[in-house]
């Protein structure tokens, strides 16, 4: 469906309406910081890389030399949590096959839970019936040690629909761990506290890497080579991330947001963190940069159409995006022109960077942006007509696209290497069930934390308000029930990811990685809009190296 056709020969009905009052977002917390950030000298970095390479081979030999299933499971989970696993994909895949073909369904709940967690996380469809062995004659879970409870708790969050035993395991372990928490000592106390806040499976990989290093350092069973390698790897990744932040900040500064688009959230560092959480391994540098630029554009579009432009200007912008041509700039009010031209210029640069063999991917990216803006215009119509969709299903027909989930996934795959094919790009754009479940999860998570804030201004009705009207609930009641729907979305995403066998594992893995970043950014507050809440975390991730 094309955007409404406009002309430039004067105002039409609605053009003279007063410009909306934009909400006041706090200014950037970072400014030019990463433009002048001083990295270690080349000699220092070379020394770090040389030592890291020695340690990398030591750890590789540990993996190859591991034979017992308990040893293999513990080692791989440790490497995953420290973000070292990407160094050893082939070796780990060989060991996963050993673990999968083993028969561990008996007495050791800790091992059974960790084996289940590891295999399901890595795409193996293992049965949850194994946990029935740990119930008594009345169907209740048997009380066990805290470490086993924690392992069961983390395993249970990889549940899919119909796995009642895992639903029950979450209720049981949550209650037990909460009761025991105040009596625990370090380091398991920190582990339990972190898990109760965010189960292991749902944690953002870069944050888990940062947070787990000090916990692993306190572990009596820690391996000194693994620990040293984890610290060096973190610091080397920090150098890479900081250089990418410098590139993204330079690109963002050229748009002169503070003068041309002062009503927009100036959050380029926060965007980078959010998007890099979905593909944080070093080989995905191009994806991270493309993602950061795309979501910066989404932010501009969202803040312009939702909070600043009047309805006529919004339709002008929608028409220009639909045309995707420099000549369409004549449609736009003055304050939109530079942004629009920069949008076209940036997409042209994507095509040049990808080269003749991969530039076809940018076509899908353009189509995803156009689709996003089309759905924005439908929401603007809802807002202007004070229309409330009758059901959540009706709302989601529009809003699961307008939240940008499809565009984010498309952006991630555009920048990846040869593993991404035309078939994968078409799958992302085809309304696939996994993509749809992800979009619903993003939309509901966003609306739970943003609805109350947005009531201060006239906004399109959210899924929360729609659900309130549909089921005659208060806002708090609706939010609680929608939280249950987000849990349902997790089950769908895991289920659909396990079933997606015709594509490389990186496809479902990327979707789930982005779900983790969404979960973090919208847990309890909108950390993107109110980014003071994550300033210290970002400093520890991108500025302060880990002490060796």
Swiss-Prot record:
Binding site residues for Mg(2+) 2: 302, 306
Top-level lineage group: Eukaryota
InterPro entries: Isoprenoid_synthase_dom_sf (IPR008949), Terpene_cyclase-like_1_C (IPR034741), Terpene_cyclase_plant_C1 (IPR044814), Terpene_synth_N (IPR001906), Terpene_synth_N_sf (IPR036965), Terpene_synthase-like (IPR050148), Terpene_synthase_metal-bd (IPR005630), Terpenoid_cyclase/PrenylTrfase (IPR008930)
Note on how the cofactor is bound: Binds 3 Mg(2+) or Mn(2+) ions per subunit.
GO cellular component, one term: cytoplasm
Keyword Nucleotidyltransferase (UniProt): no
Cellular localization per UniProt: Cytoplasm
Keywords on record: Cytoplasm, Isomerase, Lyase, Magnesium, Manganese, Metal-binding, Plant defense
Pfam families in alphabetical order: Terpene_synth, Terpene_synth_C
Binding-site positions, Mg(2+) 1: 302, 306
Pathway: Secondary metabolite biosynthesis; terpenoid biosynthesis
Any one biological process term the GO annotation gives: terpenoid biosynthetic process
Reaction(s) this enzyme catalyzes, per UniProt: (S)-beta-bisabolene = (S)-beta-macrocarpene; (2E,6E)-farnesyl diphosphate = (S)-beta-bisabolene + diphosphate; (2E)-geranyl diphosphate = (4S)-limonene + diphosphate; (2E)-geranyl diphosphate = beta-myrcene + diphosphate
Domains: entry comment: The Asp-Asp-Xaa-Xaa-Asp/Glu (DDXXD/E) motif is important for the catalytic activity, presumably through binding to Mg(2+).
Further comment found in the protein's record: Tyr-522 is involved in the initial isomerization of the (E,E)-nerolidyl cation to its (Z,E)-isomer.
Cross-referenced PANTHER family: ALPHA-HUMULENE_(-)-(E)-BETA-CARYOPHYLLENE SYNTHASE, OS04G0344100 PROTEIN-RELATED
Name of the protein in question: (S)-beta-macrocarpene synthase
Organism field: Zea mays (Maize)
Lineage, broadest ranks: Eukaryota, Viridiplantae, Streptophyta, Embryophyta, Tracheophyta
